């Protein structure tokens, strides 16, 4: 009898296990709703990093007063993504989240940036370039397994990472280049049609993300606030590879970055749950940062009277207003050309001419965008093709100085430079007009497994072309032109696949025998000469260094920096080490090695690239010597000092 009584008092072992599991599960569960951020505090309710901050009821990710800004915000408690990482590392758990965001640029035609929802095992992801790539990633397009996964809401098009357009949603697996992406829009729940919309007009946008761990699937839906959640997701990604980019516990949050262009990015509300159904966001009273809807207490009759009165008023003054408007437009056009502009290179296009050529700067004509601005393809009335680059300057003085240099460069004439045809100014926006290069940029033919790899003879020719163009800039014109941003993406290919050096937005001019008056470091990581890190002024030698990196890129088929989980690969150091070991031809692209009957020319160019990248700028060849060597003239003195032993010493000096 007593045994039976005790049995009734104690639960079974199975029940105890279930209770413990339930308690553990409950203690780690996350289920929250922020319909406003007015009362949140840093580190307690959310983790605010860098420039992210609470502004009234919303979280602002970016500081518009800082030209290079980034911000992140995370929920302080980590999500459990892999419940049992030791015994079953590929069994993932699930969660759902929904949030409302707003993206509003200062200038509608400026480059866009966007924001990301992110899962990361760290609030400071390693190797992230803070002011670019959403403040999360590097500029490498080679993926490596690490716990970082993002859903990007991208409002800029970067052709270097194969963005599909400047208004899309994508899945990023520890890489700025999306694994999959789709134009922003939603599927109508009634007729099933796909409705596109603009994420970059300041209007509130609602996003829903379902992370289905057991099925390795991510569903993303996005729609303007006011649209019910679509039945069909905007984007679905299903692949077991997801398991490679998550860890046992991960922070959930948002990240964004910017360069010189202002684009406010705000999180207005956020809900997340890993226990089941989401708590619903109330979007009724959320702030609106563009075209605010104003409520009215006026009666229908009063509103009708106001409308009728307005119609009568417009009818009375319409014709006169039209005449005044036409007069003001003519005066504005006349005032648009200021006296100081007449000093400069005179080929000035009208805005109407460029608008017609680009279909009013249509997204369908967009070639690319970046920190410099947007580039559009255009067709003039004479059927000639052009590329129009839109650049914004905040001050008239800065615009005038920029115009002075651009006008000088407009007089540059060489077959291996992208020819500038003219310009147009509209207020503080400058539009530069160039010849259109139909075959894109060199990097598109070298990296990322292009459909038609560039054969060796064309690679060799492009190196020659760029060398001759750069030699002209350094030695062949009235002034010395320092390009300062030589890289494979700034080398464009014409209809005959001949290389032309383009993008002179960072270039500086000075007299022969003089020196540039700037020490500001600009350019692209991986191409910058080491002496620039010590505030040295850019010179012909720093351009030669960048050219040497391009030579090594073209011959090896590898990027200047390839980021990896354990150690980054710096191209110059890698080739120098191979040369120091007597194996420099091993650096050549496999496609090149299989094509060439002899490796002598390949070895010569690799050695030339190393000579151009010498750590000591005084020991680098100049462009005259380089062109002479490439054209076949004996220049043994350029390379005689470049022995394997010397390469090893250079490598030591470079890392000192």
UniProtKB/Swiss-Prot annotation:
Question: What membrane topology does this protein have?
Answer: Single-pass type I membrane protein
Quote the catalytic residue positions. 485
Q: Which cysteines are joined by disulfide bonds?
A: none
Gene Ontology terms, MF aspect:
ATP binding; carbohydrate binding; protein serine kinase activity; protein serine/threonine kinase activity
Residues exposed to the Extracellular side: 30-304
Cited InterPro entries? ConA-like_dom_sf (IPR013320), Kinase-like_dom_sf (IPR011009), L-type_Lectin-RKs (IPR050528), Lectin_legB_Mn/Ca_BS (IPR019825), Legume_lectin_dom (IPR001220), Prot_kinase_dom (IPR000719), Protein_kinase_ATP_BS (IPR017441), Ser/Thr_kinase_AS (IPR008271)
Which enzyme class? Answer: transferase
Q: What does this protein do?
A: Involved in resistance response to the pathogenic oomycetes Phytophthora infestans and Phytophthora capsici and to the pathogenic bacteria Pseudomonas syringae.
Please state what the protein is called. Answer: L-type lectin-domain containing receptor kinase S.1
Where does this protein come from, organism-wise? Arabidopsis thaliana (Mouse-ear cress)
């Amino acid at each position: 009898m007593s045994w039976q009584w005790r049995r009734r008092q104690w639960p079974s072992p199975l029940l105890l296990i279930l209770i413990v599991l339930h308690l553990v599960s409950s203690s780690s569960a996350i289920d929250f709703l922020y319909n406003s951020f007015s009362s949140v505090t840093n580190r307690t309710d959310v983790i605010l990093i860098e420039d992210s901050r609470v502004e009234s009821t919303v979280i602002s990710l970016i500081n518009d007063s800082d030209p290079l800004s980034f911000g992140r915000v995370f929920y302080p408690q980590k999500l459990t993504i892999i419940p049992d990482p030791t015994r079953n590392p590929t069994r993932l758990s699930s969660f759902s989240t929904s949030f409302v965001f707003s993206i509003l640029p200062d200038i509608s035609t400026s480059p866009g940036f966007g924001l990301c929802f992110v899962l990361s095992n760290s609030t400071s992801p390693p190797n992230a370039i803070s002011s670019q790539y959403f403040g999360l990633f590097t500029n490498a397009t080679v993926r490596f397994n690490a716990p970082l996964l993002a859903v990007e809401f991208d409002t800029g098009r970067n052709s270097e990472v194969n963005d599909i357009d400047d208004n899309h949603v994508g899945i990023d697996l520890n890489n700025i280049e999306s694994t999959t992406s789709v134009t922003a829009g939603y599927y109508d729940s009634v007729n099933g049609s796909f409705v596109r919309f603009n994420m970059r007009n300041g209007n509130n946008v609602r996003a829903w993300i379902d992370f289905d761990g057991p099925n390795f699937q991510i569903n993303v839906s996005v729609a303007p606030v006011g649209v019910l959640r679509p039945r069909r997701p905007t984007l679905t990604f299903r692949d077991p590879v997801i398991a490679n980019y998550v860890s046992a516990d991960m922070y959930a949050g948002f990240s964004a970055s910017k360069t010189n262009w202002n684009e406010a990015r705000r999180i207005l509300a956020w809900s997340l749950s890993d226990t089941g159904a989401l708590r619903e966001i109330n979007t009724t009273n959320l702030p609106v940062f563009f075209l605010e809807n104003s409520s009215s207490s006026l009666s229908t009759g009063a509103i009708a009277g106001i409308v009728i009165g307005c119609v009568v008023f417009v009818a009375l003054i319409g014709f006169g207003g039209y005449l005044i408007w036409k007069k003001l437009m003519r005066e504005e056009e006349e005032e648009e050309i200021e006296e100081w502009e007449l000093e400069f290179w005179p080929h000035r296009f009208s805005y109407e001419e460029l608008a017609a050529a680009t279909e009013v700067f249509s997204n369908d004509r967009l070639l690319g965008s970046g920190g410099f601005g947007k580039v559009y393809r255009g067709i003039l009335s004479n059927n000639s093709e052009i590329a129009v680059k839109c650049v914004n300057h905040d001050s008239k003085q800065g615009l005038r100085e920029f115009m002075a240099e651009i006008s000088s460069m407009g007089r540059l004439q060489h077959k291996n430079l992208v020819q500038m045809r003219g310009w147009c100014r509209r207020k503080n926006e400058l539009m530069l007009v160039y010849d259109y290069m139909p075959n894109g940029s060199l990097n598109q033919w070298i990296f990322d497994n292009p459909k038609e790899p560039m054969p060796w003879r064309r690679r060799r020719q492009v190196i020659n072309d760029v060398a001759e163009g750069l030699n002209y800039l350094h030695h062949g014109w009235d002034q010395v032109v320092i390009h300062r941003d030589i890289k494979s993406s700034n080398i464009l290919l014409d209809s005959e696949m001949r290389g032309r050096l383009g993008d002179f937005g960072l270039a500086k001019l000075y007299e022969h025998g003089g020196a540039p008056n700037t020490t500001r470091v600009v350019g692209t990581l991986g191409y910058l000469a080491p002496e620039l890190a010590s505030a040295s002024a850019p010179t012909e030698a720093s351009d030669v260094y960048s050219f040497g990196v391009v030579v090594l890129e073209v011959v090896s088929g590898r990027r200047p920096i390839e980021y990896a989980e354990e150690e980054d690969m710096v191209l110059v150091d890698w080739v120098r080490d191979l040369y120091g070991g007597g194996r420099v031809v091993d650096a050549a692209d496999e496609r090149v090695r299989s094509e060439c009957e002899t490796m002598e020319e390949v070895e010569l160019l690799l050695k030339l690239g190393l000579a151009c990248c010498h750590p000591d700028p005084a020991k680098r060849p100049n462009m005259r010597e380089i062109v002479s060597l490439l054209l076949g003239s004996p220049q043994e003195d350029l390379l005689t000092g470049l022995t394997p032993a010397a390469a090893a010493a250079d490598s030591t000096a470079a890392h000192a």
